[in-house]
């Protein structure tokens, strides 16, 4: 199956090798800002998703996703997954276990904004299982 590559105003960036161990599939990262507030443009190849993870902070913190292209998923632990499209915004409070990534047959691009806080750190957890992930993509196809 041929997958259309989505183009946005930001460059795709290089292969996300620094975080590859926390992703299933291929992702790309273009750090747009490392000053004041870190902002990265993350591109997920079809079927790519990151592991469950938590953005910890003793005060403030969390993450904001600004979806810019393609089709993706966001899910918080214990909640149903949410389909994401260009223009969607996701506010992720500190301490919430979650994952995000592309649909099986679409590229997905978002800006990841790290919300400033005190005592911030990321905890990477288990991968989203293929079984869990494939159920979402079957629902989307219906």
Locations of regions flagged by a protein language model:
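A short beta-strand-loop-beta hairpin characteristic of the jelly-roll/cupin
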Residues: 49-52, 59-86, 96
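Short acidic/glycine-enriched loop/turn segments that link adjacent beta-strands
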Residues: 36, 59-61, 106-107
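Residue-level recognition of conserved beta-strand positions in structured domain cores
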Residues: 41, 54, 68, 76-78, ...
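Conserved GNAT-family N-acetyltransferase fold
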Residues: 42, 90
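Short, charged/polar surface micro-motifs in flexible loops or helix N-caps
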Residues: 35-37, 45-50, 69-73, 118
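A short, N-terminal "cap"/entry segment at the start of jelly-roll beta-barrel domains
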Residues: 1-38, 51, 121-142
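Ligand-binding loop in jelly-roll beta-barrel domains
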Residues: 73, 80-81, 85-86, 94-123
């Amino acid at each position: 199956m041929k997958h259309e590559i989505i183009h946005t105003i930001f460059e795709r960036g290089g292969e996300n090798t620094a975080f590859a161990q926390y992703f299933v599939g291929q992702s790309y990262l273009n750090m747009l800002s490392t000053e004041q507030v870190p902002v990265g443009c993350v591109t997920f190849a079809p079927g790519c998703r990151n592991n469950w993870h938590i953005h910890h902070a003793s005060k403030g913190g969390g993450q904001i996703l600004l979806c810019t292209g393609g089709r993706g998923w966001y899910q918080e632990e214990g909640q149903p997954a949410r389909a994401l499209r260009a223009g969607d915004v996701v506010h992720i409070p500190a301490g919430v276990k979650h994952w995000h990534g592309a649909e099986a047959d679409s590229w997905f691009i978002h800006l990841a904004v790290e919300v400033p806080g005190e005592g911030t750190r990321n905890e990477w957890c288990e991968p989203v299982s293929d079984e869990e992930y494939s159920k979402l993509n079957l629902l989307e196809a219906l």
